[in-house]
């Protein structure tokens, strides 16, 4: 159950099977997939000196063998048929990321006049590898015209993603889903149908306890994607956005205002791998150590280095050294940029208010805090987030204030169009549309507990919040997850498995997962012996992406 | 990682289509063929050699470098054994061993330098390449450079450990110490070694000792040369984990290049069109002038 090793073994196999000089033929979607798994230097090591896109104009290079890594879509089929009628390369080895329909094969065979195709295989890698336990299907919007209705393309893509995820991990799961979500039900039925239909493919050795595919709907936890994040990976995504491992941010400290683009890949960058779940405070300490590590290396070994000019010269002279220093300076500039934004957006205060809003008992002072922040000098997005969180929290307690808040947003200079996000959010993910409670239940016991917490002193006020997913997973691991909220798709499987404690769990969040949830999944994997969890989302959300998605919904829902 | 091979099914489908007659026709027996000469007598009927069927010439360099690297690896192993023997304390004469070590060291260093030379030659050859061939050549060189770099770095590491042992320095380097320290120190150590030999010669020390130190200095020189080479190769090598190491980034880059090339082409085209038009206008003006002159002459008469 490791996505990085699964994906890399696929590529290892491809490279073993085709020898000699090769050209790699991709399309836009698979370019993203390939880039999330391997690097350019990996390709060069395998004598792949050219990488081209199927849709582009290309020269004939018939001394090369072609390795094609493609998704089985109608567009690909059309382009590939054209290609085969006039082959540009010596031979074709086709690898598809998913199950190929028979009709697809037939049409391809029909066009293959020159018998250029030497092999066709299905390598199930139809998702982006983000962490070794986090995958993304890279679909920003999934809803058609009501919150319960899939957009066709998105549905198909998600379904394919899940099938390939299961096959690449060699799992034939029992399916559980959010009972209140029609999106999840439809997806569960389709996945289950494919598993039965392709029984030959899903013919794996039966494990002692059946793996579980848990389909969740984002609407049951609209809180997590709206919160300010305080761990490294999540923070970078929240503030700048991680696009398939690439981050671009404008470097305000450097002279030119041009934005810098960097790569964050936990498999290639040991420092990032180690610190991605650290909170901002610990991160600062680690960064400092990292820099001083570089410093001691330079001073200890080459004592003649004294000035910065010496240092620069030294770095130029020793390329291996430059690699480390490049990485150090990458993280230093990223972290310094983060702290700039934290200050500019007053995120420390915002974060505190947010956390008390979602973790503590509702208090009347919350409104004043929010009000103060709405008229302070912070960005539109932050204001919207705060208002959205307040609205979700006080939706039933104080509806008057919730609507007053929307007026205040407009008065505070937020685009009225964007303010419409809040009613839509309440319509999609409001109290009556959710199951379970993302907020701590308000009863005497919890009040006593929060009182106790106050006495003991909270360890870190900024990271009190636990995503709803955590409690679901805890229940599931202990075999306590209720069937009323998360039923099995097939009732016969229930009898065998209902009381078992599952070992392998694949969680798919329809509507997008977050890095905060990924953090907790990683923590589970590290601390719970015998339990292995993989998290996947239709996309990886940050607050901007989530608000965008809600905006998109508000234009579509009738 | 499950996978499924569909080649068999695909070939069955392919065979069921009749279009494969085309291929049969080509290979079918043709009575005319008997009387055809091997070389066309008719000069007009030039045989076409399709260039895209042939790999570019520089691809063969890879084989050469492969065999050189293989050779060095074998030599490095031999050298390892000699080193192990040499550092063992014994009273017997070590001159022969030292000579062997020296010979191997020089051989390896030369091989590495030959590799580098080959690369440079290839680089010069491919400078004129265009389009995808240029890109391919660049990637090709970068791969070879990084391979040579890794091999030579390993060799240097071994050499500097040996050198440290010889010079009685602290040879127990902890394994956690990264390659980085090695590079920094191996050059420094080599430099100081060479200086020391020079110093000894000046002071006119015992000939035996000088001879020994000179042998050591030879190794040190080799290290410095290789360090220099490492630097030169760095220009070609892709930094791992950097943006240039991303596959999508590279594809984007080539697309940008292609687009800008296209733009240039359009510009050039319109430019050419314009010059044609301009020429035509000039021609017309000249014609008019000429006609006026003719008219004037006629009127004057």
From Swiss-Prot, chain A:
Gene3D superfamilies in the record: 1.25.40.60, 3.40.50.1910, 3.40.50.2060, Syntaxin Binding Protein 1, Chain A, domain 2
GO molecular function: SNARE binding
Domain of life: Eukaryota
Entry annotated with the keyword Protein transport: yes
SUPFAM superfamilies, sorted: Sec1/munc18-like (SM) proteins
Knockout consequences: displays an accumulation of abnormal vesicular structures and leads to valproic acid sensitivity.
PANTHER family noted in UniProt: VESICLE PROTEIN SORTING-ASSOCIATED (PTHR11679)
Function of the molecule: Vacuolar protein sorting-associated protein involved in Golgi-to-vacuole protein transport.
This protein's name: Vacuolar protein sorting-associated protein 45
Protein species of origin: Schizosaccharomyces pombe (strain 972 / ATCC 24843) (Fission yeast)
From Swiss-Prot, chain B:
Residue span, t-SNARE coiled-coil homology domain: 206-268
Subcellular location: Golgi apparatus, trans-Golgi network membrane; Endosome membrane
Pfam families linked: SNARE
InterPro entries xrefs: SNARE, Syntaxin, T_SNARE_dom
GO terms of molecular function: SNAP receptor activity; SNARE binding
Cytoplasmic topological domain residue ranges: 1-279
Sequence ranges on the Vesicular membrane side: 301
Keywords annotated in UniProt: Coiled coil, Endosome, Golgi apparatus, Membrane, Protein transport, Transmembrane, Transmembrane helix, Transport
Transmembrane is among the record's keywords: yes
Major place of residence: Golgi
Any one GO cellular component localisation term in the record: cytosol
Membrane topology: Single-pass type IV membrane protein
Regions crossing the membrane: 280-300
Coiled-coil features, chain-numbered ranges: 92-120
GO annotation terms (biological process): intracellular protein transport; vesicle docking; vesicle fusion
Role, per record: t-SNARE that functions in transport from the endosome to the late Golgi and on the endocytic pathway.
PANTHER family noted in UniProt: SYNTAXIN (PTHR19957), SYNTAXIN-16 (PTHR19957:SF83)
Family indicated by similarity: Belongs to the syntaxin family.
Protein name as catalogued: t-SNARE affecting a late Golgi compartment protein 2
Native source species: Schizosaccharomyces pombe (strain 972 / ATCC 24843) (Fission yeast)
Encoding gene, per UniProt annotation: tlg2
